[in-house]
Amino acid sequence: MRNFILFPMMAVVLLSGCQQNRPTTLSPAVSGQAQLEQLASVAAGARYLKNKCNRSDLPADEAINRAAINVGKKRGWANIDANLLSQRSAQLYQQLQQDSTPEATKCSQFNRQLAPFIDSLRDNK
């Protein structure tokens, strides 16, 4: 049951996290922990795509993490700790592997939800 709930929650984080354009008007600040969680979720999803969904076009984990940090910087999140991001992303990746959602569903959802992030990975190559 826990795993069945984990995937939809990760999907919501991925959808709402780094895929939105930064608004031009002032918005409430996002806590450092929420920033880390959003970026780590995106990195974990990309890593899952690479390792479990046959996306050999995706770069090494370190490059994915750097790209996630760059996304954060573009959003004005300058204080993301690379080591914490790597650790949290690895934890989330392990949770995704243990999630009972069918792999085809996870791959399809992540491919769709992470398309803008994956495009940014290609642009940075």
UniProtKB/Swiss-Prot annotation:
Sites of S-diacylglycerol cysteine lipidation: C18
Lipid sites, type N-palmitoyl cysteine: C18
Compartments where located: Cell outer membrane
Gene Ontology cellular-component annotations: cell outer membrane
Family that this chain belongs to: To E.chrysanthemi OutS.
Function: Involved in the secretion of pullulanase.
Name used for this protein in its record: Pullulanase secretion protein PulS
Source organism of the structure: Klebsiella pneumoniae
Chain's gene name: pulS
